[in-house]
Every structure is written in structure tokens, then in C-alpha cells.
Design a protein with these regions (language model features):
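N-terminal pre-catalytic "stem/leader" segment of glycosyltransferase-like enzymes
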Residues: 1-88, 389-493, 498, 504
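Active-site proximal beta-strand in glycosyltransferases
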Residues: 112-129, 307, 508-513, 520-541
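C-terminal amphipathic helix plus adjacent low-complexity
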Residues: 337-402
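A short, active-site helix/loop in glycosyltransferases that binds the activated sugar's phosphate group
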Residues: 152-176, 519-520, 538, 558-584
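Catalytic binding pocket for nucleotide-activated donors in carbohydrate/polymer assembly enzymes
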Residues: 180, 260-267, 294-359
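Membrane-proximal helix-turn-helix segments that form the acceptor-binding/catalytic region
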Residues: 138-155, 495-503, 538-539, 545-562
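A donor-sugar binding/catalytic signature common to diverse glycosyltransferases
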Residues: 97-128, 276-318
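Conserved catalytic-core segment of nucleotide-activated headgroup transferases in glycan assembly
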Residues: 33-41, 46, 183-261, 334-336, ...
Length: 597
């Protein structure tokens, strides 16, 4: 998003009223309209009770025609599509009274008074999520932010929320109410009439229909699509030779895997039917074959056969990790084609009352309808409120966490000083894209990664860029900085602080490191207690870069307490930046190696 569009979004927020009748849905960042949000959109656009609502759906430009055709097929003509990051999209983002997401809200979204955010999730997790799978730490920040912005969370079961709350380190950070009302997308599994009609229209009424939906491999930012597709191609060709003539297998790769399977020459295996809702098609199937995907929990609503085809079972569980061993599920687990074919030919059916109660007890034909009624003025469902955490909250900005004495000392300082408090560490997520293991050094702290969008540390309005350039000129010329320009930039800092830090409240901000200017700006405008810990590399940069020195001194002027890593550093600071009136102390984080300089 460029400066012009960003300024337009802020203008819309400031000048356009929130419209309580405008509903906005963004599914998988505009890549599709699927799962829970498809089910909700269908309910809102086809039921007379919601005719007063205007329904807008986000999509990417390349997906517009396919999504329009999908919605037309299901009679969802009242939907208005807005292209992600277009002016129309920004208007809706700024003014919609109700906003839905199944992954995260736009990274630059700032919730207004009168807007309510509703977050669902795309499945009951078997494979690890969030900080439990640190290879995806780079993208976790905005997903975590989505949960903290939410006013209402739609969860299929208690297990799913427990896993999400723990894996995204959300304890005490979420203020939303939770509804355990089943998954809206699963309501279709209870529609036997629709199942029979679709089987007839697809020409498989007399076939044994098998669906194959494997999950993806790799990281969200680096899906190993080619290797997985090549492996699946070989496996499917082998499976095709072994299937019975009354069997047809519909194969569908995960949306994150953009590779295409070559199925035209196979006899029994074809591509998953296009132009239809995935769950509508799943309801027509007799058997689901999957692996570690959440779809297996959803399909369990049907009580039909489920087979786990985990050809990389030991490797996947070891490298990616699962919340429990897939072998504990009440379904056959197959690691090769022979065992898979045997499982497909075995008698249907399974029974496990404990599994059903734990994962799909809330699902029903009317789950989606009941949920929409709950949200938009109809009969209410039971809501669970999150407990309030009274513990003092300390936010620590930790910089890059390079291996060495500074990081080792910081670890001990934070643990000893704030051990009785709730400690949150925050950092720029891009710094740990390839070095996420550095974050393992702080197991006692809750992580609050700042999600840098499109490579920008900060986003500015035109007048704020002008103010920044004015300040830079004054610094370069050795002149006093204009107070009005400084206040304009302070307002930018307040807005970015809200956006980056999920609009959560903290009792103390401890800036422990980092060579960026943006966090110094946020520190200076933080409304509560501020501690700044000065380290060697910060003072070294201040000596080389007058602009950094200005913002560092500005932050220290506003600090309630300044801690120096050692006495020599304190003396050098006075020579370079001057004296400060707040409480100051020598922390003795590491020896005075600069003594005598």
C-alpha cells in the first residue's frame, strides 16, 4: 500500500461514519471465499432476515471472476466484491460496522469506535500453530493481532481455543467473548438432501466417492510446493492403478500449494470439482483421505469413513510437530499405498464417543444460522468471557537479540527485575525471519511481534513526512527543532504504536535495545511508566548518526528511569547527549570494557 492509499484510508477513518449495516468479510487475505466465511456470507445474502445488511467481500484481482461465479452459483448475488487495497476496499475497511476474518485483519487496519471485529479460525488444529511452530514466527504477529482486535471469537470447540490461546501466547491479552457454536462451514454435512442432489448432478450417484485433501508442507512464507506436488503425482499414479472400477477419487491440493497435478491420463482419479464450495463437495463424498489437516475433524460430523494417508508420518511429526500423535485418532493411519488401498476397501464406519464430544459436539444443521442470528439481533447463544489478568504488564522492546554479552545480560536482567510481572517482549518480526531461534532465549516472556508490512518500519501521512523532513533539516543544520513538527511526528508515533502493539495496554514500557528510530518515537509517547536501558551499540550509533542521537535523547528526556549497562557508558552518554533529570542507575549488565576511553 503506497502513501496515497494509506492517507486515503486514514482520511476515511476520520471523515466517514461507521455504517452499522455494512458487513465486511475477508477470507484468507482475499485469496478465496471459503470455509466458515463462505457459509456466513451465504446465510447473510440468502436469508430475508438480513436484507437490510450490505455485504462486502474482499478478493484479490486475479480471483475476482472465479469468486463472482462461485457466489452466483449459490444465489449470493447481493455480495459486493472489493479488490484488496483498492480505494473501495479502504472505504469499507474504515466504515464497516462488522468485520469478519478467518486468518487476520489487514496489517494497517485500526479499529474505530463502533466497529466490531469477529474472528473465526480455519479449523481444529492437529499440526502445531503460532509460536509452537517457530519456523512460521515471521507471520505470527499479524495473526496474533487479529485475535486481540476481536470482539467475538467463533470457535468450533474448547480444544481449538485452548490450542490457539497457548500457541499464540494470548493468555490475558484477549478481551473477546467466545462462542462455542460449532463451525459454520460444517452445517452442510447435515444436509442429506443437498448431498444426494449434488451426487446426482456430478454424475457419481452410483460411485464410491473418495476425496483426497492433503495439507501443505514447509513454511507459510516458503511452502515446499514443487517437491510435494512431484511426490503426490507419483503416489496418485500408483493409487490409480489399485482402485476398483466403482471408485472415483477427487484430489485437491491445499490453497498454499499453487502447483498443478497432472491427472488427465488417470482412470479413477480426477481433479476436485471446480466452481463449488469445498465443503459442499465434501458432503457428497463417501470417504475422506487426508493427513494432518483440520478437515478430518470437520468431516467427522458425517461419521463416514476417514483414512489418514501420512506417507511422511515420522518426518512430519518430528519436524513440524502435532499436538497429539495422529495414530491416536480413531481412523486408520497408512504410510504407504498398500495399506491405503486396504483401508479404502475395508468396511465403513467408526465409533468414538469421546472424540465426537471433544471435537464436533457443537456442530449441527443450524449452527451457521444460529450463529448469524446471535450476531445480528436474533436469539442469543451462550458466550464465554475471558478472565481479567490483574498482573502488572511490562512491555520490553528487545532489538535484534544478537548472540553475545548484551543479549545474555538482558535475559538475566529481565528475568530478575520483572519476574513477578507479566513480561511481554516485542520486536520487529523481519529481524527474525531466518533467526527465530534467538527468541527461544526468553521462555518466561510472552512474545508480541511487530508485523512489518511490505518492508516498511512505519507508515506516514503526507504532513507527517513533511514534518520528518523538517526535523531532519534542523538536525543537519544544528538548529532547534520546530515544536509543531515534533508534535505532528508524535501523533504518527501514537498511531503506529496502536497498530503495531495490538491496541493492548501495558503498565510499563522498557526499551532494552534496538537501533531503530521508530521504537524510540513510540517510547516517547507511551502514556505510562517508561524505562530506557542504554547499551553500547545504541550510544555508538548516536555518535555516528545525528538523527538517531536526536530521537534517542528525546526518548531519554521523556523517560522515568534510565539504566546504563555500566559506569563507563553512563559517562560517555553525558558527554554525547547531556544530563537527564529522571531516576538513573548503573545496571552492571556486563563489565566496564570501555573504562578509560
Amino acid at each position: 500500500m503506497n502513501d496515497v492509499l494509506y492517507a486515503y484510508y486514514q482520511e476515511c477513518r476520520q471523515t466517514m461514519p461507521v455504517d452499522a449495516t455494512l458487513v465486511f468479510l475477508e477470507s484468507h487475505n482475499g485469496m478465496e471465499l471459503a470455509g466458515n466465511l463462505f457459509a456466513i456470507a451465504r446465510e447473510l445474502t440468502t436469508q430475508p432476515a438480513y436484507q437490510h445488511l450490505r455485504i462486502c467481500v474482499c478478493c484479490l484481482q486475479d480471483h475476482l471472476r472465479s469468486l463472482q461465479a462461485l457466489c452466483a452459483h449459490y444465489g449470493m448475488q447481493r455480495i459486493t466484491f472489493v479488490i484488496r487495497e483498492s480505494r473501495e476496499y479502504l472505504e469499507v475497511l474504515a466504515t464497516a460496522g462488522t468485520l469478519f476474518t478467518d486468518v487476520a485483519f489487514h496489517p494497517l487496519f485500526l479499529k474505530r469506535s463502533g466497529q466490531r471485529c469477529i474472528a473465526t479460525w480455519h479449523g481444529t488444529p492437529l499440526k502445531t500453530l503460532g509460536f509452537d511452530y517457530m519456523a512460521d514466527e515471521y507471520v505470527v504477529g499479524n495473526q496474533k493481532r487479529g485475535f486481540t482486535l476481536a470482539d467475538l471469537l467463533i470457535m468450533p470447540n474448547v480444544y481449538t481455543w485452548e490450542r490457539i490461546e497457548h500457541s499464540y501466547q494470548l493468555e490475558g491479552m484477549v478481551h473477546a467473548r467466545i462462542v462455542y457454536g460449532g463451525s459454520p462451514r460444517n452445517s452442510v454435512f447435515f444436509d442429506e438432501e443437498r448431498r444426494n442432489a449434488l451426487r446426482h448432478s456430478l454424475g457419481v450417484a452410483d460411485k464410491r466417492v473418495i476425496t483426497y485433501l492433503p495439507t501443505w508442507r514447509g513454511k507459510v512464507i516458503d511452502v515446499d510446493a514443487r517437491a510435494q506436488s512431484e511426490q503426490l503425482q507419483d503416489l496418485l499414479e500408483e493409487i490409480d492403478d489399485r482402485l476398483d472400477d466403482d471408485m472415483v477419487l477427487w484430489a485437491k491440493l491445499h490453497r498454499l500449494n499453487h502447483q498443478q497435478l497432472q491427472l488427465g491420463h488417470l482412470r479413477h482419479i480426477v481433479a476436485f470439482p471446480q466452481g463449488l464450495d469445498t465443503y459442499d463437495v465434501l458432503n457428497a463424498a463417501d470417504v475422506l483421505v487426508s493427513d494432518y489437516s483440520s478437515v478430518l475433524f470437520d468431516f467427522a460430523c458425517t461419521r463416514r469413513k476417514i483414512v489418514l494417508f501420512c506417507y511422511d508420518y515420522r518426518q512430519y511429526v518430528r519436524q513440524r510437530g502435532c499436538y497429539f500423535d495422529p495414530a491416536q485418532l480413531p481412523f486408520p493411519l497408512c504410510t504407504d499405498v498398500d495399506s491405503l488401498v486396504d483401508a479404502l476397501r475395508s468396511p465403513d464406519g467408526w465409533e468414538d464417543a469421546a472424540f465426537v464430544q471433544r471435537f464436533v459436539a457443537h456442530d449441527s444443521l443450524h449452527a451457521c444460522r444460529n450463529l448469524c442470528a446471535h450476531i445480528f439481533g436474533g436469539p442469543k447463544l451462550h458466550e464465554v468471557r475471558q478472565p481479567v489478568d490483574p498482573t502488572r504488564r511490562v512491555l520490553c522492546f528487545v532489538g535484534e537479540l544478537n548472540k553475545g554479552k548484551e543479549t545474555d545480560a538482558l535475559f538475566h536482567y529481565l528475568r530478575e527485575t520483572f519476574g513477578a510481572d507479566r513480561c511481554f517482549i516485542t520486536y520487529m518480526n523481519h529481524l527474525f525471519k531466518t533467526h527465530y531461534e534467538r527468541l527461544w532465549q526468553f521462555p518466561f516472556a510472552c512474545q508480541v511481534p511487530m508485523y512489518m508490512y511490505q518492508g516498511y518500519y512505519a507508515h506516514f501521512l503526507p504532513q507527517e513526512r513533511i514534518a520528518l523532513e523538517k526535523i531532519r533539516r534542523s538536525i543537519a543544520e544544528g538548529k532547534e527543532v520546530d515544536a509543531a513538527a515534533e508534535e505532528t511526528l508524535a501523533e504518527q508515533g501514537r498511531r503506529e504504536y496502536r497498530r503495531y502493539l495490538y491496541e493492548n495496554t501495558y503498565d510499563r514500557f522498557v526499551r532494552c535495545g534496538g537501533l531503530d528510530i521508530e521504537s524510540l518515537k513510540w517510547f516517547a509517547v507511551f502514556p505510562k511508566e517508561k524505562w530506557l536501558i542504554l547499551q553500547e551499540n545504541m550510544l555508538e550509533k548516536a555518535g555516528r548518526h545525528p538523527e538517531y542521537a536526536y530521537f534517542l535523547k528525546r526518548a531519554m528526556d521523556r523517560a522515568d528511569r534510565i539504566g546504563y549497562a555500566n559506569e563507563a557508558l553512563a559517562r560517555r552518554s553525558v558527554r554525547l547527549l547531556g544530563s537527564f533529570t529522571c531516576q538513573q542507575q548503573i545496571l552492571s549488565l556486563y563489565p566496564d570494557e570501555t573504562e578509560g576511553m
